[in-house]
Amino acid sequence: MSTLAQVTLYFACQAADLSTQMVRDSEGHFAEDLDNCFRRGVSVYEELEQKLPCLAMPSVPCKPMFFSRLQSMMGFTGVYFPFTGEANVNVDAPACLVPATIAHEMSHQRMVFSELEANFVGIAAAVSCGDPVFQYSGWLMGLIQLCNALYAVSPDLWYQIAAASFTPELSTDWEDNNAYWRALESPVEEAAAQTFDTFLKSNGQDLCIQSYGACVDLLVTWFGDEAGAF
């Protein structure tokens, strides 16, 4: 099994184990209190800062984003304003990924401006913190990144991993996320993506929006040993 597949399986198993611990509504959908997540988000980097001291900075709480639905229509889950240091998170997006998005946006507050690095750092912070809700959200966000990469090269292996590891709870969150974004696909989202792509290029991020996918290389490198010993 390739390292990519090993790390994907590792993330799937971690997410599956935590999926049954999350608060859910009567239909099984993720129902953790997001207000509490925003309050607890200020401590999410404490563990990762021990391994990466360069990230040790005072935390500023993220805020729920006004007009979140509009941001979803443009394909955005969060916005960081570098001039004020304020990070805003889309709360109309699937709730199961909001905690990991909080961690992602807080990485920008720590001078991680590249989207490639911010995606990785946010996931690493979330899964290493002591909060099960942030951990689950981080494993899930990383799993989505890894599965997209694995499916592109080996769909059969991806299906084998999903069949072997996904719990009903994890499957529900996975489908909720896919259905939400599928329903919002439109020319508006495509135009916004092109505009953001141009913005990233102008700020020296040569991989542009594709840099989100390049996060997989960092995940495989960082978690490869753990996955190999799993």
For each predicted feature, which ranges?
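Hydrophobic or amphipathic, alpha-helical segments that drive membrane association/targeting
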Residues: M1-S19
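Short helix/loop segments within enzyme catalytic domains
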Residues: I123-W158
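Membrane-proximal, solvent-exposed terminal domains/tails of membrane-associated proteins
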Residues: S114-F120, P132-W139, F166-E175, A179
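Auxiliary, metal-adjacent structural segments of Zn-dependent hydrolase domains
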Residues: L18-G85, V91, A95
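Active-site recognition of the HExxH zinc-binding catalytic motif
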Residues: V98-N119, I123-A124
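Helix-rich C-terminal "cap"/substrate-channel and partner-interaction subdomain
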Residues: L143-I144, A152, W158-E175
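Solvent-exposed, acidic/flexible segments
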Residues: V91-P99, M111-E115, V133-Y136, V188
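Pan-zinc metallopeptidase signature
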Residues: S165-F230
